[in-house]
Amino acid sequence: MTATALVAGRTALVTGGTLGIGFGIATQLKEHGAQVAVTGLSDQECAKAREAGFSAHVLDVRDREACKKVVADVVAEFGELNVLASNAGVYPQSSIEEMTDEDIDLIFDINVKGTIHAVQASMPELIKSGRGRVVLTSSITGNYTGYPAWSHYGATKAAQMGFVRSAAIELARKGVTVNAVLPGNIVTPGLEAMGKDYLDNMAKSVPAGFLGEPKDIGATVAFLASDGARYITGQGIVVDGGQILPEEPAALDGI
């Protein structure tokens, strides 16, 4: 546990929490004092998460009833649920020209409907806790910038932010805040597979001069889940090393 212990005594559920950014979120919440349950797509993923000290549950967020079952299991184990970090998502590539209905349905079913399912399932417990926190993992893509072959992904991330703003208003008087973290380029196993040269070139496009890590997203989620963020709701917090700023990184050379 860190010295700050932002979420000590709270119980958090992190969907898609067995890998990458999700695992970084789960780890930071745990280090800040929370009891943490994660979900993953396979028994193998969940077994590794349990070895790391997490309660772990197999879940496909497209299944509304399965989401309710996981929440019930978490409450049965820990007694309550205070924090939902809705992180489960996919980011397949496809050009607009080649995109099929199946491609579109898959990404919207997971990134948008799956997010809503997780929030719906968690709401009764979050409201009951009196200090509920919902934090979505969205993206700068679709909200501040765009990339070729990810137009459908960007559309889902913009939709998530629309959900955040309206859900924040709907739940504000019920003691629940709803926010999102919008990551820039974060080093995950998928990105590392692109190779060192690719990562080095990507880092040069970021004013900070380096790529973020899952723990950077996790630390932001831990803050948004804390009492220190009680007056923050309906917001998207960008964590990108200055990536969306208009200044050309080359202009920083020599400074």
Segments predicted by a language model, with ranges:
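Conserved glycine-rich cofactor-binding loop
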Residues: 11, 18-20
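Alpha-helical segment proximal to the catalytic Tyr-Lys
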Residues: 124, 169-170, 230
